[in-house]
């Protein structure tokens, strides 16, 4: 864990080694036909949108995706280099090269047809009774065939130093319950298309028309019943209401028809590790407990077979994979064509062996100097957030002291892990099918999780993203912020650009992740990562009142005719966006106070800060993807992460001379502020 100096000893320092004569901005990204005071997103990103039309293989394409594409090309260079050589069996190079070759070999997959999944499908068909099918589910428990709830080891949110078995709702192929129960025309169209898709997939897997129709109806009926007892994405955001700790004895009493001990035992989990568990959604488990008793053998068969289909469709013939893409890519998201083979293959290797690929990636592409710059930026943002906490008049000194304690104990991860996962037990066998090897990878990760987490303390060195990922995160149970090497590149971070650009780009990202520790979810966890109330009643009430204003504000943003942002679902991300802006701007001003920056390319330093921020969220997106994200993405759309945030930032008004009558203008008494 990084040692943090006490707050009173911390000072903001300039980021050394950064040039002061480059703006980092690209004039072509701007649309000067738009007044920044009326639509800052369009002014800052309109040119980028024109220069980067939506590729037919994408439903959304933004600067995040652009950078991830560049990283994927680098990863592909690594893999093609490995592919050309021979390696001893069992080496990580052999595993990467052989898996990549399998992912590329579409001719072999087309020749094999359904052979990789026929044995398990025949087993399911041969099972004649419910008892036979339940035994078969136990045999394949590690693959979750037909299981309608999720179980995995993760931190106990009220004893965050230890792992515990967490049990929660699952069983919806479409992810969000609204797809099954809402009756607006767009949702009904998706629902009808989903039924046709289920039918088509069963036929492609060898079932005749009558069998496919029967299984389609069973799957859709069962998933709809599960949707009716499921919580919405918004309801899943409340940590306290999704935490119910109980003994195994109590679980068995409450849900007598869910044989947890038998299921987990079949997964390889010893009984002593499940004597106490956490149930996320008790009403879901109660509903499922009743639903299970009503299932017929045909229902169970259909669910198990559907699990096989959905778990294998991307790894079998072109015809099957294309049918999968037609629904999830085209119908659900508005993509026109699938990614090229090299990209799909590269992504599959990353999905299964991403961290070991990341180890090669950082050696080749991540300069240690970038890590040094980031450490200083993070330090400065940490100081700034402490100052922002002190400046809040709605908080008591008692709560501020606890907030500082939490801020001081942030675990900071930059670039890549200090220790790497061990892949020695993973066997990649090129004589077996691509799908068989994917299953081997999944079982390896499943078993590794059990081995490393069941009954054991939380490993604070574990990374939840690979180093090459273009993203960042805050984890409340370890109180950590993580910035993988993948995001530490242009247009978020440029060691040759001045502080205005870097604080507006990666600085806001850092501030965003830090603010997550104090958003509506993060504030419920203490300095040690435990879900524990450290707020006075008055301060908690003040926080909730202010946060609710953000939810209401975003509820009124119309993203498509008749479709609005979900302010409750996106609340945490919106609070983090606004807090990140405030914290990073404050840090930037202090870091440059003794060495003021110059106007470059016609823009003042403060203007460049906000242009860099807006550039982070430049994108093009389909209407279908907008609808999909509004239903289940906790992030607001890119446009509104800019135009929804900046009207509340006082410094933005000064930098861009925003006045009454301008479309970006909000009266001071309507500007929201939390951090």
Residue ranges and their predicted role:
Residues 1-20:
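Bacterial Sec-dependent N-terminal signal peptides
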Residues 39-43, 164-166, 480-484, 517:
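Structural recognition of the beta-strand scaffold that forms the well-ordered cores
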Residues 68, 219, 254-258, 278-282, ...:
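Intrinsically disordered, low-complexity linker/terminal regions across diverse proteins
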Residues 20-28:
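Short, Gly/Pro- and small/polar-rich lid/capping loops
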Residues 35-38, 43-108:
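Active-site-surrounding "flap" and adjacent substrate/cofactor-binding loops of secreted or lumenal enzymes
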Residues 57-79, 212-229, 502-508, 601, ...:
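Short secondary-structure subsegments characteristic of cysteine-rich extracellular domains
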Residues 82-376, 380:
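Noncatalytic, helix-rich "gating/capping" subdomain that lines the substrate-entry/channel surface
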Residues 29-50, 180, 184-204, 571, ...:
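Hydrophobic/aromatic-rich, well-ordered segments within soluble, folded domains that form packed cores
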